[in-house]
Structure formats: structure tokens, C-alpha cells
């Protein structure tokens, strides 16, 4: 799955100075939709594919805005649960007797979002520049695979959705901060944390998706003024960003439906089996000069 979040830091991306073509826009939007919810690093794949086939990074702001499409897919797929959380939270705010699980879930998501917002704002220059290095992305793709394997081995995977606590939310919220590093995967970080905490795979995955909504939507909306401004130097035009967001929405919805079925009966170690050779391949391409760091 944003997974990595380019977060609030992605708003101004001075590196993108040339317009990208429509083929690149569509391809990257499909990649965004496919990889946003899989624990294989969406931002890492976008950077790698863009550099490999078009010789340039499409930019953090392109990623942040197109992510709005994939997050819209989350809103539609989990519309019932989201509505229950929103109405339950407001009901609990104004009436103490109505403070049930949805009220607590609302606060869990709010509190768990705070760390990634703070780090996203404070570390925006680091996110835009130093961390968007292909060697870092390749290394993290490999190293974080070990975390997946350990989470699967050590996690008891027995706690259900209604057993989530504020402690779980805070820990998964801190894990979400790892998504600032391309190659980690936002979903990979939060789901792994959930497994270590003993949550069932499908529970950790579902909460990971819900937890991403405020941060990723905030990131994309924060980036909109700069992304659509003619003088912003963004790689894609307003029309390309709009179409790309719609494509990411459709592909993202399909990806969510598939992943929720997959995790019910399959280990996340399968994704580690993909990430390790992918990271090694990127390192080889870098060493051969076929990719720019």
C-alpha cells in the first residue's frame, strides 16, 4: 500500500521543472494505485519507475496529490465504518453516555496522526531532498523486509478490531512516521507494528488504512496550491494531476478489495519475498549507472 506518505512536506518540490507526458502520468498513477496499499513502498516504486523509464523523478508533490485518489478509494471502501466513527465521535463529544467504541476509535485516529504531522512539517526539507535517494530506497526495501518476517513470526495475531486500544493506536501512529523514508511503506510500517502488538492481519490492515486517511488527505490538500500553480515548477499539469488522481482511485479501490481478502489467509512474508529481490535489482541498476541516485 504510502504505502509511504509524502506528507505535508511535499508541498513545494523544486526538483520538478519539466512537464511529464501523458503516458508517464497514467503509468505512475496506476503504480500509485497498485502499490499505495501493498507494503512494498508506493513512493519508492514511483521514484524507481519514473527514473528508470523517463530519466527523472516526477516529484514528491505529484505523489502527494495523486495519493488523494487512493485515499478517496479508502473513503469509499470503508464508508460505513468511517461514517460510524464520525457520528460516534461527535455523539460522544456532546453526550458522555454515548461514548462507545466508535468514539474511542475517533480519538485513536486523531492522536495517532499527531506524530506524523509534526515530523512531516519539521522534516520537510529532509523529506524533499536527502531521503529521496535511490540508494536509501533500495536499502530500506531490503532491510524492512526483515521487519515483516519478524512481525509474522513474533506476532500472536489473535486480537480483533474491537480490542484496539489507545496504546495500539499511538504505537502504530509512531510506526507511520517511518513512511517518511521512501522504501519503508506506510502500510508496511503500521501493519508490522499491529502484528507485533498481536492484532490479526486483517485488523492491523484495516486500522492501517483508516489511520492513513487524515495524514495522506492533509498531505495532498496541502500540496494542491503549489501543484496546480503555473509558477510552481510541478512536473504535471492540472489536467494530468486530475486524471492521474482518478486513475489512482479506480486502481486503488481494486487493490484494497484484493488485499483485504489476501491478508485473511496469507502471510505478509510474501511481500518480503518481493521486496528483497526488488531492492537488490535497484542496487544493481544504480551500480551500472542505469538509475540516477
Swiss-Prot record:
InterPro entries: UppP. Pfam families: BacA. One of its GO terms (biological process) is cell wall organization. It is a multi-pass membrane protein. GO terms for molecular function: undecaprenyl-diphosphatase activity. One of its GO terms (cellular component) is plasma membrane. It catalyses: di-trans,octa-cis-undecaprenyl diphosphate + H2O = di-trans,octa-cis-undecaprenyl phosphate + phosphate + H(+). Its EC number is 3.6.1.27. It is found in: Cell membrane. Keywords: Antibiotic resistance, Cell membrane, Cell shape, Cell wall biogenesis/degradation, Hydrolase, Membrane, Peptidoglycan synthesis, Transmembrane, Transmembrane helix. Catalyzes the dephosphorylation of undecaprenyl diphosphate (UPP). Confers resistance to bacitracin. Bacitracin is thought to be involved in the inhibition of peptidoglycan synthesis by sequestering undecaprenyl diphosphate, thereby reducing the pool of lipid carrier available. Belongs to the UppP family. This is Undecaprenyl-diphosphatase. It comes from Corynebacterium glutamicum (strain ATCC 13032 / DSM 20300 / JCM 1318 / BCRC 11384 / CCUG 27702 / LMG 3730 / NBRC 12168 / NCIMB 10025 / NRRL B-2784 / 534).
